[in-house]
């Protein structure tokens, strides 16, 4: 069985400064994300053993652990691609038009997304996703690493609101972190995800 691996980043840890510090990015990538990758592989190994032993209680436990750690791995893999030292500004083209259609304007979208991030209780993510059934953009608060985002949503843009993503630099002032995040958003990546979602995901759930 192939194992999950920690992806390399497209930029150096310090490349997002002053908006997100190199120290945070290094710890975030080599410690936190790496822990989720290990957790996925450990859960898969334990799940295989539990199935061989027909231990249903252990199967359910490790399926739950797999969902959490795989969620963490997927979320962070998107996170690193969503960021760029050349980011910021606003989206263009079809993505910009879709944002205007769904939210009224980019400024209204940004306000709604920021409110989702700043208002999240506990740990989680704010997510801009594409609803493959309704063919529309929606925002969500993702709880922990895998809860509260419905099936059929393809994530396009995420901001990590776990404290490890910002506390060393911004302490408890989450709003300053979210404001800084907009300076490093890789809209080219978000546009690429949007194009793939709209062209490849139609009919996958409801044919």
UniProtKB/Swiss-Prot annotation:
InterPro entries: Fe/Mn_Superoxide_Dismutase (IPR050265), Mn/Fe_SOD (IPR001189), Mn/Fe_SOD_BS (IPR019833), Mn/Fe_SOD_C (IPR019832), Mn/Fe_SOD_N (IPR019831), Mn/Fe_SOD_N_sf (IPR036324), SOD_C_sf (IPR036314). The keyword Manganese applies. Mn(2+) binds at residues 28, 76, 160, 164. The keyword Cell membrane does not apply. Binds 1 Mn(2+) ion per subunit. Belongs to the iron/manganese superoxide dismutase family. This is Superoxide dismutase [Mn]. The gene is sodA.
């Amino acid at each position: 069985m192939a194992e999950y691996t920690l992806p390399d980043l497209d930029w150096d840890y310090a490349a997002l400064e002053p908006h997100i510090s190199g120290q945070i990015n290094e710890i975030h990538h080599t410690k936190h994300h790496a822990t989720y990758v290990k957790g996925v592989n450990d859960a898969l190994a334990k799940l295989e053993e539990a199935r061989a032993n027909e231990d249903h209680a252990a199967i359910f436990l490790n399926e739950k652990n797999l969902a959490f750690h795989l969620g963490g791995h997927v979320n962070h893999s998107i996170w690193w691609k969503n960021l760029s030292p050349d980011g910021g500004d606003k989206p263009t083209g079809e993505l910009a038009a879709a944002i205007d259609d769904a939210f009224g304007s980019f400024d209204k979208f940004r306000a709604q997304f920021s409110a989702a991030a700043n208002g999240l209780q506990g740990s989680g993510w704010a997510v801009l996703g594409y609803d493959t059934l309704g063919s529309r953009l929606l925002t969500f608060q993702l709880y922990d690493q895998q809860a509260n985002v419905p099936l059929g949503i393809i994530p396009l843009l995420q901001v990590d609101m776990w404290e490890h993503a910002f506390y060393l630099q911004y302490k408890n002032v989450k709003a300053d972190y979210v404001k800084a995040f907009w300076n490093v958003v890789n809209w080219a990546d978000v546009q690429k995800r949007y194009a793939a979602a709209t062209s490849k995901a139609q009919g996958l759930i409801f044919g």
